[in-house]
Curated annotation (Swiss-Prot):
One of its GO terms (biological process) is SOS response. Gene3D superfamilies: P-loop containing nucleotide triphosphate hydrolases. Belongs to the RecA family. Keywords: ATP-binding, Cytoplasm, DNA damage, DNA recombination, DNA repair, DNA-binding, Nucleotide-binding, SOS response. This is Protein RecA. Residues 335-357 are annotated as: Disordered. It comes from Shewanella sp. (strain W3-18-1). It comes from the Bacteria.
Length: 357
């Protein structure tokens, strides 16, 4: 198709004028001078990284993680911070709930000496701190825990029982408009933890909703629904949770995938257990009876012992992790088949044998 030369000249002139006024890169053709691959940070769970499609949470975007109480929301964000710090990135934690446990964070691998932490007095203060950190361009990951605890100043200064209809939603809506562009410019990942509330009078459909209005739902590139699906027992003692995360919204890859993993109390995500399960599912690790083998060498009797071997041999664990990422991220449907197989195995797991009961 022939293009009018006068239109081409006019377009070139206006593009030149826009770039002169707003800076180079302020407007461009979609396929030109930019990386089409989104930079990501690992969530600490291999199966969740694969379910997200891009290999982790996307930089320069807003992410919402929500779920019931004690489902692993804060643990998941601390795992993301630990993964980011291992890559040399700077992280900040906005603790609006005033409930961050530094000892637990340290156990999960977070470098608490280099983690920026703020406990703001009001919701506006928390969001202003987020915006200032973002505009600095020096912070790579910001976590806000939680949206429900971002209390507007008017509500704090008022009395208990006063009506403040829509204040939090209006505050969040204004913050999202301001933050979204700045996050993209500075390539900062902003994670909001959110709580669940019940809508009154819902007869059909899901009565669950998240706090803070609808703005966050629209601006978030990724929304994760995290749930506790069972307990992990060592004998009679409960030592962790079976956890399922569903990717409810995803703007960087296909949504609606889900991942299942274990969160062990005081340790975080059971990475080696995940490697054993996915390794067996994709024929990287051989299983004969209760024995697990890798490249012909026995690595342990029972899932727990195989996981312990990988913990003691990080080079082998890293090799299996790398192979699985290459396999699953190039072929995400492979995980879907293994996840559907895993769905029938809900329940309690004996740490010694790895058996479901």
């Amino acid at each position: 198709m022939k293009v009018d030369p006068n239109k081409e000249k006019a377009l070139a002139a206006v593009l030149s004028q826009i770039e002169k006024q707003f800076g180079k890169g302020s407007i461009m053709k979609l396929g030109e001078d930019r990386s089409m691959d989104v930079e990501t940070i690992s969530t600490g769970s291999l199966s969740l990284d694969v379910a997200l499609g891009a290999g982790g949470l996307p930089m320069g975007r807003i992410v919402e993680i929500y779920g019931p109480e004690s489902s692993g929301k804060t643990t998941l964000t601390l795992e993301v911070i630990a993964a980011a710090q291992r890559e040399g990135k700077t992280c900040a934690f906005i603790d609006a709930e005033h409930a961050l446990d530094p000892i637990y964070a340290k156990k999960l691998g977070v470098d608490i000496d280099n983690l920026l932490c703020s406990q703001p007095d009001t919701g506006e203060q928390a969001l202003e701190i987020c915006d200032a950190l973002t505009r600095s361009g020096a912070v790579d990951v910001i976590v806000v825990d939680s949206v429900a605890a971002l209390t507007p100043k008017a509500e704090i200064e008022g009395e208990i029982g006063d009506s403040h209809m829509g204040l939090a939603a209006r505050m969040m809506s204004q913050a999202m408009r301001k933050l979204a562009g700045n996050l993209k410019q500075s390539n900062t990942l902003l994670i909001f933890i959110n709580q669940i509330r019940m809508k009154i009078g819902v007869m059909f459909g899901n009565p669950e909703t998240t706090t803070g209005g609808n703005a966050l739902k629209f601006y978030a590139s990724v929304r994760l629904d995290i749930r506790r699906t069972g307990a992990i027992k060592d004998g009679d003692e409960v030592v962790g949770n079976e956890t399922r995360v569903k990717v409810v919204k995803n703007k960087v890859a296909a949504p609606f995938k889900q991942a299942e993993f274990q969160i062990l109390y005081g340790q975080g995500i059971n990475r080696t257990g995940e490697l054993v399960d996915l390794g067996v599912a994709h024929k990287l690790i051989e299983k004969a009876g209760a024995w697990y083998s890798y490249k012909g060498d026995k690595i342990g009797q029972g899932r727990a012992n195989a996981g312990k071997y990988l913990t003691e041999n990080p080079a082998i664990a890293a090799e299996i992790d790398k192979t699985l990422r290459e396999l699953l991220l190039s072929n995400p449907s492979a995980l879907a088949s293994s996840a559907s197989d895993d769905e029938s195995t809900e329940g309690n797991i004996d740490l010694e044998t790895g058996e479901i009961f």
